Each structure stands twice: as C-alpha cells, then as structure tokens.
Amino acid sequence: MQELSQLGGYFQKLAAGGFVINPSSSSSSSNNSSSNTSSSNFLSPYEYQESSTSPRDTTDSSGESSLSSSGSSSSLNGSCNVAAKLIKFRGHNVAAFDINGKEMICLPQVYEVFLKNMVGGLHTVYTKLKRLYIHPMVCNVEQVRALRSLGAIQPGVNRCKLLKTSDFEKLYDDCTSTCTRPGRPSKRSFDDWNNGAVIIKKDKTDSEPVNGPVFNQLMQPQMTPQQILMQHFVALSQKTKNSFERADDDDQNQRDADDITPLNLSKSGGNSENDSDSLENMRKEDSSPNTSVSDRGGSNSNSLSMSMEAGSSSSSGKNDEASMMNKVMSLIELASQQFKHEREELWKERSEIQVLRESFHKIVQEERDLRKKLETQNKKCTAFEKRYKYVKKQLLLANADLRRYKEKEEQSSDGNSVEL
C-alpha cells in the first residue's frame, strides 16, 4: 500500500509538470530510502527553469562565473568532482575544467573561436593533433551536460573533447607558422582574415575594369623574328591605309571648299546690296577701273595660292606614300638577308653534324675491327700457351730420361772398375 501511495505521488508530480533527474535503480530498496529519493529526484518547473539558465548572463567583470544548480554540481567520471567554469583565454571566454591541477578547455569551442577561419574543419584539427602526438581527452556525459549548459557546444551535440592550454598553443602555432607549410605562404590570423576580406571588397568596388590580366601579359610566349616582322608589316599597312584615307579626305575637302567659296561670295553680295548701292558701285567702277583690276588680280592670286596649297598637300601625301614604301622595302630586304643568313647557318650546322656522324661511324667501325683483332690474338696466345706447356712437359720428360741414362752408365762403369 505504501508503494502504491508513492507511485500515486509520482504520477501527481508528473501531472503537475515536474522533471525526473535520476530515476530509482532498484525496486527492492527500503521505504525510507525510496521516499527520500522520490522527494529529491523531482524539480518543479520553476526550479528547472532557474537551474537551466546560462551562466553567461551572470558573468562578473573578470570573465569567470560559476554554474548555477545542476551546472555547478556537474562531476567527472572519477573519484573527484570538478566543476565547469569560464576562463579568459586569448581575450575570449572559454569553458574549461580543472583536472589534476590542469586547465582543460573545450576543443570544439576553441575551434569555433580561433581556428575556424584557418583550417578546413575539425577533421583537419584532429589530423594535426595526431601529427603533433597530442591526444585530447574524451568528455563523459556529465561534462557534456555542463558544457552544453554553459553554451560551449550546441544543444544537440552529445560528444566533446578537452585539450590542455599548452597543447592548444602548439596547435595554434602549427596552424599559423610557415615552417609547417613548405612552399606555401603563411596562414593569417583571425584579424588578418577580417581585414583582408574588407580590403578585397573595397578593391573590388573601387577598382576599374582592366583590359587584360597581368598574368596573361607576363606569360605571353616569346615571338620569333618572323612574327615580329609580320606585325611590323601589318602596322605599316594600316598606317599607309590611314594616310591614304586622310589624303583623299583632304583633297575632297579642298575641292569642296574651292567649289563653295565663290558661291558664298556671290550670294552674300547679292543679299547685302540694294539698288542704290548697285548704282553707286557701278559709278565707282566706272571712275576707278584700276581698283577693279587690282581686286580681280587679288582674287586670282588667292585662287592660285589655294590651288598651290592643294598641290603641296597632294605632293606631301605622295611623299609620305613613297617614304612608307621605302621603309617597307628596306624591312623586306633586311628580313630576306636575315633569312638567308639563318639558312646558311643551318646548312653549316647540318654539314658539321653530318661530318661528326660520319666520323663517329668510322670510329665505331675501327673499334669493332680492333675487337676482332684482339679476339684473334687472344686465340693465338692460348694456342701458343698450350704448345709451350706441351713442349715444356716433353723437355722435362727428356731431362728425366737423360738423368736416368747417365746414372745407369755411371753404375755400369763403377761395376766394371770393381771387377777389374
């Protein structure tokens, strides 16, 4: 009955909105212990809301804050209980634990704060840690909850790793130093990335469009003399064409001016003169014929000067054409001479190469003949050596027989002397 009453109390608290922290592990515990655990395993909604508030809102001026309620009571898997806290690290508030007298910081948080703009991702960080022989510590469930309550990791993350501050310094130096990146430029820090992005945006907005990239201008292939000559020809032809067009335009304008000038004079004279003026002019012409003759002479001289100018302009255009043609002819002669010289040099080099090739073939043939002679001489030497050994052997045998014969003669002579 008592257990049923306890279960009824549980259901009532659950209906009221309470939250279970640690459910009872064994159903065979005593009544007193079960009643105590039942009273301590539930929190009211107000108490849970107070315990789940982030301590970032209650940080003091020094940057450190302690966890409230459940955050402050978070413990490690071990004999000692270590509370999570916020420390000031490189000008930022970072979640950390005091483990065996060492500060262990949250690796995902410091990655987001310091290394996100320097490396490609956390997998790159783990690769660097393996290369540096740094082994981060894996968080347990209580540590993950404490870090989640501090806001160091996202709510859905259930895994995390801790790293020593000294090991993070090594990792940061490895990510920013040039010695670990042979043949590559040095990596930039977080501030450099931000400043660089702002400068690039300003340059893109302020810069004007360029005709072509500098890279293409620097990487142009080297041009041969023939290509340079063709470029000169094209430029000269364009220049002569433009000069011809200018000369034609000048001649046409001059002709139009010559045709239009007397018409304008006659029209203006007709419009400005009245009847009385015409009579007076006729009288003046009658009284002074010399002045009219002189005026006519002046007009004739003006027309002659204009015609001379037109002739001089046409002659200057012809002179320009002649000079341009002379330049083109001189360039063609220079190019032909250069081509002839290069062709002669190529033929000389070809003949020299042919001579060297023939001499090389002769040397190779002589070497083959000498090798054949050497082989024959070696064969003769081996034959003579065999004969020499045979003759020497026969000579030794003959000497041995001779000695035996002499010994026999001496023995026979000694026996005869003894008999006598």
UniProtKB/Swiss-Prot annotation:
MF annotations from Gene Ontology: DNA-binding transcription factor activity, RNA polymerase II-specific; RNA polymerase II cis-regulatory region sequence-specific DNA binding
Protein name, as recorded: Dachshund homolog dac-1
Biased composition (Basic and acidic residues): 242-258
Any one GO BP annotation for this protein: regulation of transcription by RNA polymerase II
Family: Belongs to the DACH/dachshund family.
InterPro entries from the UniProt entry: Dachshund_domain, DNA-bd_dom_put_sf, SKI/SNO/DAC, Ski_DNA-bd_sf
Gene: dac-1
Key word Transferase present: no
